[in-house]
Amino acid sequence: MSHPSPAGKPSNSKNPRVFFDVDIGGERVGRIVLELFADIVPKTAENFRALCTGEKGTGPTTGKPLHFKGCPFHRIIKKFMIQGGDFSNQNGTGGESIYGEKFEDENFHYKHDREGLLSMANAGPNTNGSQFFITTVPTPHLDGKHVVFGQVIKGLGVARMLENVEVNGEKPAKLCVIAECGELKEGDEWGIFPKDGSGDSHPDFPEDADIDLKDVDKILLISEDLKNIGNTFFKSQNWEMAIKKYAKVLRYLDSSKAVIEKADVSRLQPIALSCVLNIGACKLKMSNWQGAIDSCLEALEMDPSNTKALYRKAQGWQGLKEYDQALADLKKAQEIAPGDKAIQAELLKVKQMIKAQKDKEKAVYAKMFA
């Protein structure tokens, strides 16, 4: 008989907790903390716990360490699940359990009735090994076929980041890896707060913060704090860290926007726009021209007449040597703010670049037909 998933997190304080520190494309994005339902499926939970600690040594079937460390999420299907656990072949064809190559389905007590559930991947009945998946939506068609044995209690935002990684088919285009993993004992910190020395005291993902996302004043307070930290990194020319903090602001704002009244959304818009523009500025400093253009386009969706976005977008086009595109954006900006001297100076510079480019082309043609 199946039962609904536990409403509380954690469902049982005596159940083991484990963690994954996740890297996407070589960059640490955060920690997922999982409760294992040892009270309901002890054998399945123990298998996963030991694979997180690596305490069982080498697997007799694979000849590889029975450990998730360094193991990729090899399969991602948006609005379905993220899958990993193949520590031997790293492509979905390998892995093994701590009990041998495979072990039986323990029970189907819990349903796949929401996101954030941890369940065993298999190749049919009684073929559990080391591979697992985390649901990102309810998946009722898997009930009675896959053993649900845990749940995400912190770091659901990290799971969502994995879910939204670009894929080729079902394979992530960027390497998504369990960089570190282990068990959290009673009294251990869960590791969801940043430790970057910036003074940032907020969890990286709003889902993990003990706040009411409908409290707009609180969200604005947190957002201003994070933005100021981002500005400090910007001033010290630490562009990557600045982007991380501005992006974190946007996560908090987006989570709040999803649950508040439309009238309150407008209160969040100015700081959101500012952070998107600042991300664009950082990308310009990093010579990430297309990234800067994309950020400016995002800003222009919020405010189509924003001259700062048009100006920075033009700088991105210049980096790509698309001077005609840059000229078009600067002309739009000048129409909106005809007295802006910075726009005028940039416009003159781009016109000179276009002239120099044309003169160079003429010289090439002249040599060809001389």
Curated annotation (Swiss-Prot):
Ranges for domain PPIase cyclophilin-type: 19-183
Region of interest called Interaction with HSP90AB1, as start-end residue ranges on this chain: 214-370
Pfam families: Pro_isomerase
Compartmental location: Cytoplasm; Nucleus, Nucleolus; Nucleus, Nucleoplasm
Phosphoserine PTM sites in chain numbering: 5, 198
Entry's Gene Ontology cellular component terms: cytoplasm; cytosol; nucleolus; nucleoplasm; nucleus
Chief site of localization: cytoplasm
This protein's name: Peptidyl-prolyl cis-trans isomerase D
Source organism: Rattus norvegicus
